[in-house]
């Protein structure tokens, strides 16, 4: 039963798919890619009571076990998406009814840098296959300058706007697209720089329900190279700001190019070598994933064939029984009449 005075969870928009609903814990998390979403999904899965180890069996080209949390949502058994909850039952899902409805955002400069590294620079197999021939696809770097130049080329090409496939990729869409700040009535939208505030609020929320617990927060999907000032020089930072101005308008009260957090002034030679290792490892992961998926597809076909043949055998058996039983019955009747 809902109270008409409660703010509805949605403001006239379709229920989005990037949502994780925990009815017993009165939590609704709206996930945003490249904003601690791997760690936050593990946290949500643990609170919800999902079988965490079951995620490891996915066959996609995930770089680590922790990345398997991104396998298809059909694998989640206890954490529905908002659209899976009938409209008639969504009334109680409201910040005014004690629900914690939240999303997390980050400045667009570090987010794009993170997305470019994890998908392109380390050569994620899917992205190599789909975009490897594009002019803006980065080379395997030999130096810091290679990385800086290739990121600049990517930014100025703006393929998340011009490429029809990347245009649909949520890793490179605005955060506004995922968060829908005007369409969802949030308890709060948190900044990645202030995650401790989110965790404190989650603990307080769970404690109020008598369900407080330790939060499972594995650190995952770290980018091999931290953001350094050189990455945003030469007009790159300004170009990113222009492209993602919508996010700055909606969330960026404390964001500005001169406040972007960087770490160090340069990368060591070892850091570049470590990055090179990532590209080689991802290539091999892609090989193994492809073989595994092909084997799984062949197994499904074999199982379908077995089921089909089993059905045909049963039909033949039924026909044979229908043919033989009357004969046997007639023969027995003749014997009885003698």
Predicted segment positions?
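Helical coiled-coil/dimerization "stalks"
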Residues: 301-338
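Membrane-interface amphipathic segments in extracytoplasmic regions
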Residues: 1-315
